[in-house]
Amino acid sequence: MSVAPTLDYEHRFLSSGARLLAGIDEVGRGAIAGPVTVGITVVDLSRPVLLDDVRDSKLLKESDRERLEPLVRNWSVASAVGHASAGEIDALGIIAALRTAGTRAWLQILAAGVTPDVVLLDGSHNWLSPETQASLFDDAPAGPGCDAPVHTLVKADMQCLSVAAASILAKVERDRIMRSLHGEYPAFGWDENKGYGTASHKEALRAAGPSPYHRVSWQIL
């Protein structure tokens, strides 16, 4: 099994005065159907506690993710998951849709009475902050958003426990959505491929045409 993520990287933010850190990861960015989903877990850096068996969600079996989900929620100071639909991805573009999903999760954290001091975001690009725009053609979002400092780290989901835990929450919730949608459109095999562009998914798409849950603005065939 891979090396267990820790809170070592997160702990360095204590020296800058941060106590509550929000680890954030997304799931579904590369799918051709279904939502993009963002998970958040908040940890108290002044009282670091590790959580056994947590890994980046992609490295875990589905049964392990399901088992760990309630443990992650109990371990976190606060946690949340937000989604942006395929229609929103088509209308906004993927970066703004990620921001929309992340903002929805962020506002849930604030509504729970928790205000993180800093954010650790998986990847190299800050798609979460309201002022961040992918291009001149990507509209800046209206309304409230994440106003905490955002730090990005490539492969944070592999080494940082807060981000790996967030990836589990996002993956479990999105997979449940795709299994539910499979009941409406069983031909696409979403119970197995979770909306990703497998050969069988694309073959069904060519035969039946897109559903309302496909990202039709993408070159999905």
Curated annotation (Swiss-Prot):
EC number(s) given by UniProt: 3.1.26.4
Major enzyme class: hydrolase
Cofactor binding annotation: Manganese or magnesium. Binds 1 divalent metal ion per monomer in the absence of substrate. May bind a second metal ion after substrate binding.
Transmembrane segments: none
Example GO molecular function: manganese ion binding
Keywords: Cytoplasm, Endonuclease, Hydrolase, Manganese, Metal-binding, Nuclease
Residues that coordinate or bind a divalent metal cation: 25-26, 122
Entry similarity comment: Belongs to the RNase HII family.
Protein name: Ribonuclease HII
Origin species: Arthrobacter sp. (strain FB24)
This protein's encoding gene: rnhB
